[in-house]
Amino acid sequence: MEPERKGLSLASSSDGDGREENKLKQGISQDLASSSRLDRYKIARQLTEKAIKEKKIFSIYGHYPVVRAALRRKGWVEKKFHFLPKVIPDVEDEGARVNDDTCAKVKENQEMALEKTDNIHDVMSRLVKNEMPYLLWTIKRDIIDYHSLTYDQMLNHYAKTASFTTKIGLCVNMRSLPWYVPANPDSFFPRCYSLCTESEQQEFLEDFRRTMASSILKWVVSHQSCSRSSRSKPRDQREEAGSSDLSSRQDAENAEAKLRGLPGQLVDIACKVCQAYLGQLEHEDIDTSADAVEDLTEAEWEDLTQQYYSLVHGDAFISNSRNYFSQCQALLNRITSVNPQTDIDGLRNIWIIKPAAKSRGRDIVCMDRVEEILELAAADHPLSRDNKWVVQKYIETPLLICDTKFDIRQWFLVTDWNPLTIWFYKESYLRFSTQRFSLDKLDSAIHLCNNAVQKYLKNDVGRSPLLPAHNMWTSTRFQEYLQRQGRGAVWGSVIYPSMKKAIAHAMKVAQDHVEPRKNSFELYGADFVLGRDFRPWLIEINSSPTMHPSTPVTAQLCAQVQEDTIKVAVDRSCDIGNFELLWRQPVVEPPPFSGSDLCVAGVSVRRARRQVLPVCNLKASASLLDAQPLKARGPSAMPDPAQGPPSPALQRDLGLKEEKGLPLALLAPLRGAAESGGAAQPTRTKAAGKVELPACPCRHVDSQAPNTGVPVAQPAKSWDPNQLNAHPLEPVLRGLKTAEGALRPPPGGKGEGTVCSRLPHHGHHVAACQTTGTTWDGGPGVCFLRQLLASELPMGPGLPRDPRAPPCLVCRGLLPPAGPCKRCRSFCAAVLQGASFVRLGGRSCSPRTP
């Protein structure tokens, strides 16, 4: 028993030593890990501070690993919004428990996730989480609020680029090309129409019918050319053919005998349509009336269309077509000289129908029957049909490589729109179809070369083995192919410069529609299809072209073009990679600002204002200054209560007409006790040593405001004309420079104004001033404070008298030769007449009292 216990004790001691050693090793490793983390954190902090100082902070939305790696190599720090991986949420259902093992596993997964993300770039990203990114690289522009960006922030997109990045926008913009550059869009862009409006549908229908007529002429020429070429073979070659050619000829003759023969009238109608088309191009239809034009009816067009379908699909033939060969050949030569798209039209009249604003080959179909195309456009709901379908002429004679259709993806970069700056990429790649080319089938697998469509299809068994299995070539590989075919110079002389010219033309037209934001750039991808003559035809322009490395070709070129884009748009150094400057618009210098020449410097002259005391005191409202001349005279005047009712002469004076040209008008109906049937009794109140009467209500001529009181000074019953003093007029005129209708406060007045006006009448200027003083209350009638004229007021002895003297201002009675009005004696004013100033009421300019 003892040895066993001893062995157990030794074993336990050895196990304890091993545990201590393991703990020691774990502690050392943890210290090393903590020290390495600390050093890594210091380095990350230093690099982050440098990046913040140099404004090298970027954010990426989308799958752009090449851009991220390239920017990090250049010292940029990425600001991530969600950089931690998702972990299992700690959620417990009601009544359920999570055991310790599950909690331990969740904690371990969280620690492993933190360790995986604990690299230097993630540390730097956490340090700049509160900083503003100065470069935003997104897959779509709508993700970023375009107008909230600062001037220092760069974005890889422009706003309002739908004018050339959508099919409908490019279709409409290309029609305006002749207004910007001397070029014909039909020479590089297949004609295109929108099926959303009736006018566009009618234009498409006319184009389809013209193309149908020219296709009939092509059929006649091609059919006779084939028969002549077969007959022009040497005799020995025909003999070598033997019975095989004889049997094939007999089969063709038997097949032709079974076909439906079409009359030669079909060719005559086609020639007539083509001649009318040429006449329109040469403007021969201007001098021809609309009635003289013999156009086909809809029934005739329908019959011609059905015969054309039978002809091009091999169900019919024209028996005596050889008789029309020379005529058709001459017309085709004329059409080719004016229509550069005659070669790509072919015989089948195939059109490609595309959605107006979709990409990657979605919902694209090819059709060769006009009724089916119009039915497709009419099938949609009218409210959702706006700008949905675009129909474009399909290139029926493309350049083929090993009987397979292909297109070219070409990149270009725009770094500024004002002035327009375009960079063209030297490298491009070709995309092949998986099927052999044929016009007998209108399947999208044959006629669409988009990788988004072809990647789901298998290559045709009968396709040439020279073509790559991944269906892509680089432009360098294509140039080698052309060199082997003996056409090596075509790339540099025709294809490459024509693509550059097409891109430049498209951007010049779209320049006015794009929002030209500084510190922005965008990479675009243009698709071209080559014709048999190696001329490139622009199909569409794509924004945000795919950079996915789907094939070895795209893995190489897409990474290369992204790095070169950063060199041109971000670094702006001398190294621009494979980009070359395609077009830089000349900078238009703004005109020099000449606003300083219009400035006037100096100090205005200040003139001393003389304070002129008012002559008479009449309380009035400021609104009376804007009154217009009266159109109707009041029924009664203001009588003196102490003298009784007005005399008959006063009643006669009320009928006098009002003179014109007086700028002041005061009309106020007097509502007194006499209006209600009683006699008007003046109410006298003593306040501050003055006698005040109830105010006379006055009303503005054109306003509907309630009546306001107008205090009028009450003159004394006796007036001594000898007390009038005459003064020279010149010193007074220098002081009376108040604008007509101006309001200035009287000296010593509080809150009440003085109304001053100069009233022109018969060469005189009268200044009337109204201040606070006494108020009065008149009897029934209207108080007319209409006109203030020199001839209406009492004059001093020896002063001349105007023979055309108007009546009194108050009672409208005629004034005496000198002195105040004898009827009412209720007005006192300053009179300016001739060269003298007559002051009434004594030196204090106040009304006299008895």
Swiss-Prot record:
GO terms for molecular function: ATP binding; metal ion binding; protein-glycine ligase activity; protein-glycine ligase activity, initiating. This is Protein monoglycylase TTLL8. A protein binds at residue 360. Its main location: cytoplasm. Monoglycylase which modifies both tubulin and non-tubulin proteins, adding a single glycine to the gamma-carboxyl groups of specific glutamate residues to generate monoglycine side chains within the C-terminal tail of target proteins. Not involved in elongation step of the polyglycylation reaction. Preferentially monoglycylates alpha-tubulin over beta-tubulin. Together with TTLL3, mediates microtubule glycylation of primary and motile cilia, which is essential for their stability and maintenance. It comes from the Eukaryota. Mg(2+) 2 binds at residues 540, 542.
